[in-house]
Amino acid sequence: MKYACVAAVVASIVGVHSCHAQEAVDKAKATAFDARMFGGPLSQKTYACFVRRYDASHLAQHPKQKVSAMKLLVTAEDAPEDKTVNYSFRLGFKYRHRAGNFDSSGFCSHIVAENTGGEIRLGCGVDCEGGGIQLAMKDEKSALIRLERIRNWERNKPDDDASNDLVAGADDKIFRVDRADLHECSELVTDRKELAALRHK
């Protein structure tokens, strides 16, 4: 099942992409990254939503791109008992030549990307060796999603029957997504209490 096992997913993503894990991240730089990602200082639970719908012109210029639309919801939740902040992501997208909505999710931590002048990113992984993504800020209004492979599930279908892998290709390695109102990402949330909280942000 989708959440049946827990693996060291962030560590695996860090290894694949030649990055240093959270222990090596400067706290001040991580705080500055969070302010850019979430559009301000963190509260007890803070969200950021990014959306992109690729138009015909873009897809014509990227004929090998498999994805036609993408939504990203990033969450930061204060965990005072652990004296830390827990980060997670939910990713929803549509395939270009396949019907349906597909989702993935997992946990994240700060990493330092090598050969980028010490750029801070979030390294995010999916349980059970499901791959993952890296998140960076392009500017104040846009984020970049980098992936090699990420497991996803067709929405509202049994896990065992609906598992897929989105594998990076020539036009599917880096996606730019643009900041949007939180309601744009509400479809990615399944918990009723969290959905209600999101709608009141």
Question: What is each PLM-predicted segment?
Answer:
Residues Q44-V51, D82-S88, G118-L122:
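Short, hydrophobic/aromatic-rich segments at coil-to-beta transitions
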Residues V6-G15:
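Bacterial N-terminal signal peptides
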Residues K94-N152:
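Surface-exposed, polar helix/loop patches in the mature regions of secreted/periplasmic/lumenal proteins
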Residues A8, S57, A79-E81:
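A broad, structure-centric signal for solvent-exposed, well-ordered loop/edge residues
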Residues C19-V67, C128-G130, K138-K201:
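Amphipathic/hydrophobic helical signal segments and adjacent flexible N-terminal regions
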Residues Q61-H110, E184:
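N-terminal glycine/threonine-rich, aromatic-flanked beta-hairpin/loop signature
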